[in-house]
Structures are given as structure tokens and as C-alpha cells.
Amino acid sequence: MAFSYRTPQEELLSRLPQSQQEAISGFQYERFQKEEEKKVENFSFYLPEKTREWFTKSGVYLSPFAYVNHSHPGCKTLENHLLFNVVASYISKYSYVACLSIKSNKMSKMERLGSNSVKTYDILNRLVTAKDKARYGPLARPERSPCPKKTNIFIHDEIHYWSRDQLETFLQVHRPKNLWATLVFPPEILAGYKSSVLPFLYQFEIHGKDLVYMPDGVRSESYTQPLENGFLLSSSSILVRNKATGVEIRYQVSLVYSLGSHHLFHIYPTEDLMKEEVRRFGPYDLFDVGSLFVKPVRVPIQDFPLSVFKKIFIYLSSLKKPDVQSAVAKLRQLSDADISIESVFMVQEFASRVEKNGVGSWSCSFWECMKDWFFDKLPYREVLEKIGLANDFTRRLMKIKPLAFDIHTTDRPLTVRMVIDQIWGERQSSCDDVPNIIFYGRKEWLEHGLLPKVKKGLAKLVPGRETGGSDYPEEIYSDLLSSTSIWRSYDENLRHRKASPIVILKSEKAYSEAPGFSSNCISLCSTPFGEVIERTPFEVERERKKRELSFGCLDFHIRKMKVKDASELSIKLDEQNKEGLRRQKRKEKAKKTRMIPVHLLELGSDQKEKNLGQEASKGKGIEQEERRKSDEAKFDSGPSGVCSIKAENPVDAQHIAEPVPCLKLNDLIGKEKICSSGLIKTVGNDYLTLARQIEDMPLAQLKNRKAAYFCIDYPMVYFHDKISYPTFEATGEIKQIIMRARDKWGANFNSALIQVYNDGCRLPLHSDNEECYDDDEILTINVVGDAKFHTTCHGEIIDLRQGDEILMPGGYQKMNKHAVEVASEGRTSVTLRVHKRDFSFESKLRFIKGKFDCLFVSIAEIIHKKPEEVMMFIPHIVDRCVSNRGCSLDDARAICEKYEIKIECEGDCGLVECGTIGLSVGRMLLRGNHFTVASVRRSSMDSLANSSKELKSNGVLDHVMFNFHKRLRSVEPDLTVEEIKVDSSRAGKLLKSLMDGMTGIVSHNSTHEGWRMIKGINSTSEMRSFMSMIKGKSEETRGDLFDRVQELNFMKVKIYGIFGFAGSGKSHAIQNLIQTEFKGSQGVMVICPRRFLAKDWSEKGVDEKDIKTFESALKSDVKGKRLFILDEISLLPKGFTDLLMLKMHMEGILKKSTIVCIGDPLQAGYFCPKDDNYLSREGEIKRLFKDGVNYKWYSYRINKFIAKKLAIETMNDFIGIDEQNLIYKDMPSAHHFMENKGNHIEVILVPSMIEKELYSNYGNVMTFGESQGLTFNCGVIVLSEEAKLCSDAHIMVAITRFRRGFCFALGSKGSKEDYMRSMKSGLLQRMCSGIGASKEFILGSSSVKLILSEKDVSKGAGVDEMDREARLEGDVWLKSMIYLGKRYHIVEPLGQVIKLTENAIKCHIPVCSSQTLGPELDNIQAREFREFKGKNGWSNQFREEAGPNWKHPYRVNQAMSYEAIYPRHRMDDDLTFLAAIKKRLRFDNVANNYAKFKAAESRGKYLAKVFLRHVPIKCGRDQRLLDQCRQEFEETKLSKSAATIGAHSQRSDSDWPLDKIFLFMKSQLCTKFEKRFTEAKAGQTLACFPHKILVEFSPWCRYTEKVLTANLPDNYYIHQRKNFSELEDFAKRFSNGSMCVESDYTAFDVSQDHTILAFEVELLKHFGWDDKVLQSYIKMKCTLGCRLGGFAIMRFTGEFSTFLFNTLANMVFTFCRYEVPDGTPICFAGDDMCALRNLREIDTHECILSKLSLKAKVNRTKVPMFCGWRLCFDGLIKEPCLIYERLQVAIENGRLMDVIDSYFLEFSFAYKLGERLYSHLEIEQLNYHQVLTRFFIRNKHLLRGDSRHNISELEWLSDEDSDDDKGSQIEDRRRGYSNCWGEKLQNLF
């Protein structure tokens, strides 16, 4: 992300020395000074920002010191630009100019324009409007002074008051040589636009026949002019008749310059020049609102800025729930203060449509296409849309483009028609009266335009009165003349349209010519002149039909143009034909100069422009003799160097249409004629250089050979049969070979096929007749090796040796074939051909279809288009697909960028985003070089979760749920799909069992009205009949019920299944899908056999009333449901799925619904003793999925111990509890030992209900079956006699319920050994004995085949792919900046670290009461002496009353609370914020910042050298480390919760300017030791940067930090990303109790000025930063600002890597200020510095230090402090009073639980020093330390985690006597959090 593009000149200039830059800038200054001096008077008006921007983009000079006020400055500036910049440059070329309607002062200014000054002129003014009297002075008269004739005239802003007749009269009388005229007329009026396209510059209104023009929208400055007098904009010439001589003179009208509504015309007598046929205007940053909202709205608005509209639309599309309020807020953000009310209403209307109906999709289904087609054919569709009966909003939205229109010119005053661009459509041009009035005049328009139109419309309403259709031949479809009216065909420019030519066949003879021969070589077998072959009857008949068709076309055009014959038609169209010929010649010339693929060319000019006149003028009677004479004449006048041979008879002459080049002697030397067919061979050529180049070429491996295809100018695709070749542009030696062959053989070779063969390779007989070639010459060069060349023109075999060439002449391929046999390994050939054209699209399609088109098919499916449409839209991708035999991810990206869509592609390399615009529309899978569609994004209709209200539209519900399985496939890779028929007998058995009360408890027919389960049954008797019917025992064979039941026999239903091991996440994917996309939906029903499972589903977004047991599901109304989830399907009664489908079918929803089954075949199934003998024997899973299921063979739940016993992989890293798998003698023993080890028993699992009652007093007790589907941490499994009888499935349920582990407890008499001996062989026996179960044993217990899907549990292979997208849902802008593909983590090798531990010393601390510490509070001053004071009050840093959370008794005066010791900063404290701004910020402008930085570059280099002298770092960049840093940054960014990321999404807004920050103040309690009892302190400012800045720079900063850390000498310590244990080790290693030095900096952040920036830039260059990133960093530092203004160069807290750059500045300052010998230990942390030796100050670098803003006070002490810690040779000590006072503040505010752990860890560093503490602390601090010790010992129960463990280790060291040495070493303590310092040191990026 570079901030701006830099040209090579700018790059060079930035690298030049300062003096040279100043020299170059001096030239620019002088030029600028002259420019300003000349134009300041006319271009210094103060303009609004938008107007200034528009003028600048339009190329108008504006003075940078604009201060002059004016009523309409925009139009005044535009007028001055037109007069003094444009007009003056033209009229100054003439020696004399007569000036009309211009004030004298303007002309006097024109005299002083230097080279463009007007020399000699006269001013001839007259009074036209009422204001002209005041404008021109008292001498002006209504009549004009005599104007000289035949001279140069300039008319300023008067001609728009003249009618066309007046202008013609003026030209007729004065006959000027050149007439220059300025015109003010909005051109958009001629396009039918009713409001200004540049409303900030001018506005207008139309009142009848008048136009009211308002400059700058100022109504008081408006003036009125005739509306019809804008005719000049559509006039190409004016015809004037001389009354005296009667001679007509044509004046050309040329629009020389046009800007906004001001135009300059040049009118002069016609010369033979090309006319202006079309005048183009635009594009404007507008779109027609009326074209989007066809339905009438109350808002009178026609235009709206398109750039703003696009941003609003993209923003709404990026929101999950777009709403009107968000759209209006976005409008306000994007607009200035002047927002029209109409714009607000328009945005509200648009947003409400998007919110209500969505936008629709880019493509549509077949039925939607049919609907659109039908809608387009409606005769009154505009009316239907206006009255709201039809809506085509989406298609209109897609067609929105910037406003641009064309005006077609003409020289006919009454037949001018406006041809408007397609953006408006013909509908508007024919219906809009304003342009027609301008063109025709009011009278003519009413008579000739309006009345015929009304008559034509009325004729359509009367049957039989329609105008007759054209009699144009039906075989011709491409001629536009056949479908247009006479006036349109006459006036409209059709030369750019593809029209059918007029065909006249002149030959009466049935002869076919033999192919001619053209070659540079003599051939003995060329066709003799005059030889003809008689045509076949088929050819004769075809030519006859062509001739008849041609004559039919000609007759139609003659009648249509109302002429007598073809000669008159030729005269009438002659003018167009001349221009057409010129255009055709230019196009043909351009085509010859360079060959490019067909999709980069325009349509051929020969198809666009046909010389209709010349062909038509020949008529039907033209004989063959005339054609022959014409051909002879062309032939005789051929170019020199071509033999002109004249035939003796007319027949012979027909065959000499092409010139035969003359042969020269040099062309025949060294050539051998092989046969009479013209085959020529040369020998002895040297191609060694070419052979060496071919060895390095990227040739593709084909069968028995390698090959590649080269073309001059552009790589053309080439393929044949099933083979394609990679194509490249011919360069170097290849190109030279082609060019030399051109000269040598006289053939226009442009392509080369290079092939390297294997020995023995054979190419059978073939012809090089692909469609890309004509029958031209082909030259084969045998570069290396030997081969045999065989042809069909003679029987001999030609031997080819190294350096041989063989030429097949033109025409050879039609009659002969050739073959090649390679005789040596590595034989290399180069075949030169004339590649005439690209392959047709049909040929390319045939080649790739079904083999290489998977990418096009996939994208077409996602965007709902045909693959062929995608291919035609991006033809160059098709070419790459052909050449590469397939597509790549780059091709996918290119297609997405062309369509402006985003598609995700998941492949072996991870998830990749293709495209950058909008949200993802779908996802593709790339597996084995094959693209497939994984999912298609649902449209806005597809969400079931749009509302919690009940859905009334079943159409929307059906559409969504019918496609639910597609969404499920995309999130569940192990989905099993099976198509089954409903088993009516199976359903009938379960239904009868329910009716009879054998199954269930609430479905009995008599007591619970079970007959209500089936729709259409109203009584018990009807239910009995229905059951007989579905069993096939009923005699009834008619009726609705019978018919519906019979329909089931012809239906197959798809069933979806998700199966896996216990804890494998079977329901995770579908629950997440419901939670994110279908939460609160009324269309989902979940059927759960356990109430515990139901609670889990309700928490995941399913309404509780939609979670049913199997009985309540059968009895409920399912008509509104479309998704049925059967959880733990193995626990459902046998036949339930069939009965459910039967019920759904009876209610008419079976075809529209999706059924998903979730379960585990290895776990327990349904069992009920009542119905076990009646229901079917086959379980539900085996019934539905006979062929097997995809099975998740892994678990996230069970620990590693159990996973090993079951031979399965687990994601749970916990090994298992110590009691795992132990068998205790009874339940009390198990309970005691489990609880003693801290393993809380959450559940006791028993095999039967009797035992459940028996153990109920121990807590939560469940049977094995009841626990199925649930998860616990720890528990006990009871081993009783009942457990021996349980199946392996039930045992599997029991042992897989626990995350941490379980133990067994005997529940029967006897010992463990007795129980084990009586146990049968099975899963329980294997687990109790410790043997475990093999994979085969477990799989063998399944009722169906399991297709295992194992999971890769190795760390680092894309661990967080799914999490990243979910995390970024709330910030869609940030999602586009984060890499969402697969990540690879480098696993560092583990090594054994041996750490020596010290013995702790016991100590007894004297007792000290906390009351003795109270008097220190007397140091608190009164608040009035401490606060900042301002005019409006005090600051609010010190509290005088208890806080709202103070829940403890007031032990002290509230004004003397512990919080009052320290100043507190709050965001709402204005005075503190102002003090922060005054102290911590500096302001300056951008120019000064850049200038200071440039001046400091040499000092920066000096400082960098000093730094690198002390910290040697190798120059260069480690790209792998940089990539790793970028990955770490993104992972850190995404480690926050989704809610936190979403809350900061405004920072990702792309509209946030990169040079603006949001400034605020940090809220904190300043608990530093030096802040105790002080006065108020200035706040700490924080800067909030946009995410785009952080995403760009933070990876580079991380990289810099890692490189610095890796190269840092051991004696330097930087406290970044380290815990205080490492600082402790450093202090122990280097402290020796000597004098230490500390630097106390003042205003450190503000002092990071231009010199420090120059130092950073030089250092970062050395680190290997990319130059673009560096330039962006410099620009950011120099241009940064906020609402307060622009900042000077400084550091901000909150800036990326603030700590790192502060540390670097700290280090270089230290190296310059002090003499630092090698090995001196120094600690650095931001602005904190502590040297553990006594350093001497030096003045060696004083020349640099004196120019630094950074200053420091030098402190020398024997008690060094660093980051708030005392450093000593025994370790670290935190000031005990600080910890105590912070604890008291936390107690006062009720926050003790939040901070006690971190404060204890700080305290423990001092406490573990034991008796050694006395030598480092004063008596006052020791008292605080003793009070803290008592506090933490007494409150150890409040500690958590490691703190709780550590306090037990330290406890024995205090006041207890014990010989039990538990080991006093505390290893790897981590500091955690340390209030203000911790906040300061945290990584800010």
C-alpha cells in the first residue's frame, strides 16, 4: 500500500542531493512566478472545494492565492479561461479581428497576454438585452456599427440570442473569413436532461420557449435566452445562398473547445475537410435517478453523484443487515455540509428497497430469464412499472453508468435528429419534446413530429390498421436498414454498424478456377494460366440462389430510398461511401502493421463498411467484359518489381488477378527443386546459435517430443486435434530467423513451431490446414539432428540433415500431405508459417469442453451463467486455458476481477480469495488440478433468520430450505447422502405400536387421541382404516388418502447423515450454520430423544418450541417446517424416519424438505421391552444407509489415555487424570480419592435405573443411555452385575463421556479379581484389564460399514481457517486486508534446558500493623492546590468523595483515600485533555515537515552509523522471516473476540483518510512512584490509526524487532515481549552494586522529530524495508493530522510499533551522549534507560545532539530503577508501598479480584529474596512489605491459577516452622500485568 504513485522523475529527484534539488526547483519557481504574474488577475477568485477540483481536473489554471470574492466565481473563472487562455490563442494569429459584444477592458487584457496577445482589433457593440446599456456604456446603441466584410470576426456571448435565420443572414451579408463565437448553452438539454449535470457550476430552468441560465446557481445573476438557439451544437455546416449570384456557400461549423456550458465555435467557408459527425460530452459523475426508479416518486430529483452512490451501494452490500439509517449516515460521511434534501430521500428510497427485497443476484434461473424475456416483450412495460405492477430494479441497477451522451451533427435545419447514447435509450429521445423543439422548431415539430407519432400510436389500437411489415428478404438478418424507418436510415450514421453488403453476381458461366500459384521460386508443376475446371451442379445452384438473394436486397434498398434504379441509389449514398473508403483503407493499413489476437481487434472493417454505392451502380446488366477490363487495369498499374503479364484472352486474364513477383538470380542460389509440386530444399545453413537458444526455452513435454509456439508481436494460441502448445512472443534469435526467412523466401512468415523429438518419433501423413492458416508457404528448418521427410506428391523420401530447409509453397497443403520420421535423438525442427487469424471461439470451445473447462463451469454455476458466456466475456483466459491445457488460480482471479466479484477457492495451499470487490459469492474447491463448486452464496432471500416473526410466505421458505443441503455440504465435509423410498409397512408397524401404547407414553389412541398424528384423519376408526391401507390390507382403492399413500411408491427421498465417534463434532457444523444464518427461524425442527440434548440445541439458535421428542414431533403441525434434524437417530424407535416421512407427505411438504440424521453406529440404540418383539429388527441407521456412512474417526473430547486404548486420534491434549481406569472397591473410596486429587465428580454413570436410585445421594447420577450425547470433565462408572450384561455400544457411551477422565467403582459383592473373572469378553473387559480395544474390534461392532474420515492433528496445518472468517464477520472491511488462506507454522525443535535453582532462605518478618502506614496519607495536599484551573472550573484528577463501587466502611477521610494519592485521567476531563495537547503535541504544516526531513537526512545517516557500530546488523532482507511476521501479526489481530473486532470495524472503513488520526486521551490512574502526592499532570494522548495503516506497517515492524533481537549483543537488554523473570536474570548476571546511570528524558514522544525520522529511515533501509513502504512511512509522518490541524513530525502513543522506535531513539541517544565500552550492560525499554555501570559523558557527537529535540537529565545512583523495578545483584524488587497502595485502591473500588493475582506476582519477586531483602529496602518499605505478606497469606483463597500454587510454596517461608522441604523454587514466573507500565509496554500493533 503505497500512499501515492511516484514517477521515475520523482524517484530520481528524491535521490539527488539537496543542492541539486534546489537548483531544479529554482527553474520551476521562475516558471511558476511568470505564470502567476500573468494570470493572477483573472484566476484568483475564491472557489468552493468541489469547483476547484473540477477546474483542476479540466486543466484550468487556478491561482493558489485565491482571495477575490465574486457573486458567481465559477462561471466567471470559466469565462476568463475561455477568453484569455482559449480564444486569445486562436484569434491572436490574425492581423485584424472585429470583436462584437465584448467590453473594452476585456480586450485590453487580451492585448497584454504576451505571445497570445491580440494585435489589431475593433470593438463593435450593440444593445441586445436590458443590461447591455450599463455594460457597454452610454455610447452603445441598439443598432451595431457597420461591420467590415470578408474579415475575421469574434462574437462573445451573443450568438445564443441569434436564431438560425439571423446567423445565416449575417454570414450572407458579411461573408467572414473566420467567425469565432462563444456560446453559453447547457448541452445536456439536447439529451433530454431537465437539470444541470454540473449543479455546482451552473443551473438552468426551462420556461416554455425560454431558457433561464443561472451561473453558479445564483438566481439573481440569471439571464434568459431563447431555447431554440442552441442549434449550433448539432450543426455541422450552414448553407448560405448568395442572393446576387445564386451561388450556395457552405460554412463549416467546428466546435473548437467545450467546457461545462461554455463553448467556442469556429465558422468558416467549407474546405475539403472531414466534418464533425458526432460531438461527445462526458462522462459526468452523475447517473439518471429516473432510469433507476421508474415508478413515480415524490422526490423531484433527476441526478445524483455516481461515485457517492457506488460507495453507498457497496457499503450496504457489505452489511449483513442493511438498513436505511446506515445508508443515510454513509451519505453524510461522504458528502459535505451542503446535502440536498432530495438526495436524502433518494438514498432512503434506495436503501429501503435493498433492505426489503435485496438486490437480487447477478444471474438468474431459467424461469427468471423467461420472466425477464416476457417482461421485455410487453408493449406497455413502462406503464406497468410506473404504476407498480412490474419491477425490474436489479437489471436497471446493473446498467447504471456515468452520464455521457453524444450529439450527432447535420447540415439540414429541419431534419436534424438527436441520437442519444444507449444510457438513455430511444424511448426517451422519441418522447422528449425539448430536444425536438430545439431541432425542428415548435411549429415544425407539432406538424411533422408529434401528429404522425399520435397517428401511428392510434393505428396500433385498431385491428388491421398496423403499418405493413417490410418486404426485405428474410434470409438477411444483419442489415440495420431493414429494421429502421426512412428518416433514420437517411439521417443516422450507419457506417459504424455491421450491415449486409449488396451482392451482385456478374458471371454467367459455370466455371471454377483452379488455385493460383505464387512463389519466389520456379516450379515445374504450377497450374498453367487459363486452365479451368467445370463447376458441379451443387455449385451452380448455390450461386444461383446467391444471385437471386442479392437482387432481392438491391430491389429493397431501391424502393426504400425512393429512387428509380441502382445508379440513383449510388449517387444518394456517394458521400457516405467516400468516407467509408477512407476509413477502410486506414483500418486495413493498421491491421497490416501488427498482428494481434482476434478478441483484441475491432470487427473487421470489411464487415462494417461496404461500398454499397459502387456495387449498386453496376446494376444487373454489367457484363463479364467490364469486370475483366477493370482487373486488367489494376494489374497493369501494379508496383515496380512485379511482373505485369497480360493475357491474350479474357478467360486467361481472370487468373492473373494477383501479381506474380519477378524472380532474381540470388533467390535461386543454393536451392534444390524436389518435385513438380514446387517443393524446395536448401542445404548448408548455420543454425547453431538458434540451437543453443532452444535448449533454454520453456518447451512443453508432449508425447515423444517437446514443443512451443512463437509468434511475432503477440503470442497467438495454437492447437490441433487433442494437442495444444504453449505460446510465446518471438524475440531474439527466433525473431531474427523469421525475419530472415521473410526476406529470403518472400513469404510473410510470422510464427514458428519449435519441436524437439525423441528418437524414433513418427508423425503420420497430415496437412497443416488448421483454420488459423491460409494456404500459404510453410518452411521447415531442420536445426539439429536427422529426419526423413515423406510427401504424397512424389514417392521419394527426402533426407533432412542439420541446417537443411524445406519449403512447401502456397497451395501445397490442399493437394498433398506430408509425414516425418525422426532418425536421431534430440532432433530439433522449426516450422515457420503465416498465422493469418485466430482460431474461432467454437474451435476453442470444442477443444477445452469437458476436459479443461472446469474453472469456467464452476464460476458459471456460481454466478448463474452459461460457461460459454463466461468464456466469451474473457477470451484471453480461454486462450491461456488452451495453451496451458487448463486454468490456474491466476485465471480465476482474472475472471473475478473482470466480473468484479469475489470467490473463495480452497485448495491444497489453503483458502485463497479471488477478486477484491464485495463479499464472496461462492466457494470453489481445487483438488487434483480440478475446480469444483463447494458452495454458492445465498441471496438475500435465502436467510431463514430474517425475522423472528412467523413466515407467511411459503415460497421464500421453500426456496431456502430446498437449498439448505447445499449450505450444509459446504460446512460439513463428511456428509452422507442416500436416496430411499418410504417403507410403508415399517411406518405402519410403528404407528400401530404407538396407537396401542406399546411405544411411547402420550400417543395411545384411546387416551391421548393418537389419531391426530396424521393429517386428514379425524377419528379412531379412520386411523384403523388408514393403518390397514398402508399395510396393504384395505379393500378401499379410491379416495384422497389412498391416492396420496400410493404416491409414496413412486417417490424417492434424499436423506442426509452426519456420523462420527463420540465427541467428533457431529452436530457442530450444522449448529453453527443455524446459529449464524438461521437463528430464530420458524422452519427448523429438531427431534431429540434426550432432554439434555434439547438444551444444547436451544443454546445454538433453535427455538425451544421447535425442539421435540419423537412423539411430540409426530403429533405437532409440521406444515411450516422445511428442515428436520434427527439427533442421535440410533435412539429413535425403529420405523420412526419412515413414519415421519409419511406424515410429511400427507401434509404436502416431503418434496420441499430436508432431513438430516445425526448419530453414531458404535453407540447405544433404541430399546423398549414392550415393542421389541413387534417393531422391525433393523435399526434406523442400517435401514437408511445400507451402503455405509462417512464416519468421523477422531474425537475432540476424550483424553489421550482413553484415545490410545481405543486406537483413535484425539484433539484433547490432556493425558488423563491419575485415577484413570482405576477400579475402586466401592463408591465412597472412589469419591474420596477423586476429590482429594482435585478431580470433582460431575456425574456417576450406572447401567440400570435401580442403581440410579441407589446412588442418588452421591450427586448427579445417570444411566449409560441417558448420558448419550453429553460431555463431562470427570466422573465415576459403576461396575455392577448389570454392567456385565450391557452391550459394547452402551459401554462405549459410558467411557467416552469424559474430557479429563474417569475411574471405576465396584457396585457388586466380591473383589476386583472376582468381578474380572466373571466378566465376558467384550469392550468392558478390555478396558478394565487395561488391554484396550483395537481398531478392527471397534469397527466390527458397527451395524453398517464405516468409511473413516481421519483428521490431521499435527500442529500448524491451517489451524485457524474457519475461525478467521467467523472472527471478521463484524468487520467486513478488515476481512479484505487479512490473508484467509492456509497458514503454516514452523515448529521449533524442542531441547532440554537445564536451569539451576537457588535455595530459598527462611525469614521471620517483624510484625507491623497497617495502621502505622496511615499517617503517610497526611502528605496529600488539598485538592485546590493540586488541580489545573481554568476559566470554566477545575480539572477532575483527584477524588474527594467515595466512588460508586466503594462497598467498604470508610476507614479514612474520603478526601484522603488511597486513590487521592495519584492523579487520575478521564476522557471527560477537558482541562486535562487541553494540558495534554499543550504538553505532548506539536503542530506544523506539511511543507515544513518535508523541508526539515530533507535537511536532516545527512544527520540521520550519521546516527545510523553510530547505532550500527554498537549493534552490528547484517544488511538485507529475510523474506521468510518477513512472511512469518505478517502471519504472526494477523494471528494476534484475530486473537481478539469477534465482538471486539466488530466493535472497532469503523477503523477499517476505506473512506477513512490515511493522513488523519482520531486523537483522544488515555483514561488511567497514574500509579508511578514519582507521581505520589503530586499536583495534576497532563494527560497521555492516544492516536487511533486506520487499520489499513496498521496492516501495512506492522509486519515490517515485527520483522525489524525480530532482526534487532537476533543481533543484539548480550550486554544490551530490551524489555519487549519478555517477562520479568528474564529481566531478573539480567540483573543477577550484570549488577555489581556500582554506580549506575539513568537518562530521564523530557517530552520524549514530542522530541521524535525530523532528525530521528531521518535516522529511522536510514536504519530501516539497512534492515531491508521495501522502498515503497519506506516512502509511505515518510509521507505518513510528514502529512499526519487530525481535527486540530497538521502535526509536526513526532511520535504518538498508539502508533504502530511505538515502543520499538522509541527504544531505537533511546539507544542511539545513549550511544551519542555516553562513552559506551564494549560489554557495558544497559537496559532499554521505550523511553526508559538504565546503565548498570558508571558511564562517562562525551561531547564527540555534540554537533548532532545539539540539533536534536531530544534532551535528557543524567541521574547517577546506586539504586537503579528500570520499568518501576529496583535492579540489584539479587534480582528485582517492586516498591512495596506501590503494591500496597494499588491494592487499597482496588479494594476501595471493588476490583480486588481483578488485580490480586498480578499484584501477588509482583510481590513474590521481593519476597523470595528472604533475608537478603534487608540489604536493599529501607525500614519504611520493609513495613509495607510485611503488611503485604500478611495480606496475601490471609487471602490466598482469592488467588487463582499459578498464583494459588505459588503461595503454597511461599507460605512455609513466613512464620511457620516445618522440616518438610517441599522445594522452594518457583520456576518461570510470569509478571502478567503491572498497571500503568504494563499498559505502556504492551505491543500496540
Swiss-Prot record:
Superkingdom, natural source: Viruses
Domain Fe2OG dioxygenase: from-to ranges: 748-836
Domain RdRp catalytic: 1634-1741
Reactions this protein catalyses: RNA(n) + a ribonucleoside 5'-triphosphate = RNA(n+1) + diphosphate
Record keywords, A-Z: ATP-binding, Helicase, Hydrolase, Nucleotide-binding, Nucleotidyltransferase, RNA-directed RNA polymerase, Transferase, Viral RNA replication
Annotated region (Disordered), positions in chain: 607-639
Biological processes per GO annotation: DNA-templated transcription; mRNA modification; RNA processing; viral RNA genome replication
Protein name: RNA-directed RNA polymerase
Annotated source species: Apple chlorotic leaf spot virus (isolate apple)
